[in-house]
Amino acid sequence: MSRSMALSQLLPDVALTHDVQVSGLVMDSRAVRPGDAFVAIAGFGAHGLGFVEQARANGAAAVLFEPPAPDGLPVPADAIAVPGLRARLGVMADQFHGRPSQAMRMVGVTGTNGKTSTVQLLAQALTLLGTPTGTLGTLGVGLYGAAVPTGFTTPLVLPTHALLAQLRDDGAQAVAMEVSSHALDQGRVDAVHFDVAVFTNLTRDHLDYHGDMAQYGAAKAKLFARAGLKAAVVNLDDAFGHTLFAALDPALRAIGVSSRAHADASVSAQALQLDHNGINFALNIRGQVHPVHSPLLGRFNVDNLLAVAGALWAMEFAPAQIASVLGQLQPIHGRMNRLGGAHGAPLVVVDYAHTPDALEQALSSLRSHAQDRLICVFGCGGERDTGKRPQMAAIAELKADVAIVTDDNPRGEDGDAIVADILRGFARPDAAIVQRDRAAAIHQAIGMASPSDIVLIAGKGHEPYQEVAGVRHAFDDALVAAQALLPRTVLGVRP
């Protein structure tokens, strides 16, 4: 739906020499369309004032900037100086798009691991319960099942409001949204109205950005102190979650979830059993107990299901409805996806686990399903937290029977250097298999596996590419694994 608004409505406190109708608010000069207002602020490596000519050539109707302008960058005579521009972008975008987040039931999910799975499972559940639901996160934006990639876990603030408006216009009545620590720290969700906030867990990640765990946790906690929030769903089995829960505003509806019998939990999983068919437990919501039989794989998916249950209860669904829909939820692409496991082929699991905690959870969960060996293929991304590389090696050595180290997304970093960092975490590095070619590593793992083994391919999950030296090459772990499994499935023997 096309929109336009007078600039004076968006900037009532700014003296304008002339008023214009603008058809959008855009920070990327390449994305400017005729009639847009170009927002020229400091970016990650450059300032928007350096791209005014390109924005003008693309039809920008106005140029906004935050004074003072950097030295050496000319300011067009008709550019509009807006004090505190960056801080008010969320409010401006919210107003321009007609306050889309207030027109839908908004659930924000934050945490180190489980954000994507929780968002996708919640959207799937709400859709099954008759509520058209949009998703916004790692897998993209769109109504459930029709997401289009954005390239961000949480987009920048102007696109975030535009995408929410798109979901509203497409008929979404609810939105499940991943809210990263970067987004909370950088104001990407400024002026987004959330009804329910969900916390999954806090483990080591992004310390290259936040510096330490205290600052990382403080960034996550910002979601739970937002004006207008009605309910908070918190994993009480996580140490930081327990602290966060105790500090919640008493005016909030606080819903603690636990699969480990935490006394303060109002939503819990009891009598938990994992088998080759999935997960079985009794869902207890404030004393109302209903059985859940889920086809999902892995102990941590119990936590994801409880997060979904807590969010649904916060949205006033009945416990019986919640238990029923949990059992209908199907796996998310790239999150503990199952391949093989029949006709002489080993069970192969593709998962996005790319942090120490996520890898440990994936391996520990699969150990409870394994009849024989657990083979792990993993690597670490380039230009990211180097401290987690030896940690992931130690976990793979401890939790798997065979560890194969390979390339993840080296990006602009030397792959041999990444592998060297990883190998430092092995007590016996000579026992690790190094095969930097990821496709070859996957074929090697599946080729050595017996029918009773489990192969975990960790790190990339849903990603359809591998980034090497700044170039994204087509690559899909699940597709490569399926190709490697084909001779096993057809012949029923090892190739």
From Swiss-Prot:
It is found in: Cytoplasm. ATP binds at residues 111-117. Carboxylation is probably crucial for Mg(2+) binding and, consequently, for the gamma-phosphate positioning of ATP. Its cofactor is Mg(2+). It comes from the Bacteria. The gene is murE. GO terms for molecular function: ATP binding; magnesium ion binding; UDP-N-acetylmuramoylalanyl-D-glutamate-2,6-diaminopimelate ligase activity. The modification N6-carboxylysine is found at residue 220. A motif (Meso-diaminopimelate recognition motif) lies at residues 408-411. GO terms for biological process: cell division; cell wall organization; peptidoglycan biosynthetic process; regulation of cell shape. The keyword Membrane does not apply. Belongs to the MurCDEF family. MurE subfamily. GO terms for cellular component: cytoplasm. This is UDP-N-acetylmuramoyl-L-alanyl-D-glutamate--2,6-diaminopimelate ligase. It catalyses: UDP-N-acetyl-alpha-D-muramoyl-L-alanyl-D-glutamate + meso-2,6-diaminopimelate + ATP = UDP-N-acetyl-alpha-D-muramoyl-L-alanyl-gamma-D-glutamyl-meso-2,6-diaminopimelate + ADP + phosphate + H(+). Meso-2,6-diaminopimelate binds at residues 384, 408-411, 459, 463. UDP-N-acetyl-alpha-D-muramoyl-L-alanyl-D-glutamate binds at residues 29, 153-154, 180, 186, 188. Its EC number is 6.3.2.13. Transmembrane segments: none annotated. Pathway: Cell wall biogenesis; peptidoglycan biosynthesis. Keywords: ATP-binding, Cell cycle, Cell division, Cell shape, Cell wall biogenesis/degradation, Cytoplasm, Ligase, Magnesium, Nucleotide-binding, Peptidoglycan synthesis. It holds the Pfam family Mur_ligase_C. Catalyzes the addition of meso-diaminopimelic acid to the nucleotide precursor UDP-N-acetylmuramoyl-L-alanyl-D-glutamate (UMAG) in the biosynthesis of bacterial cell-wall peptidoglycan.
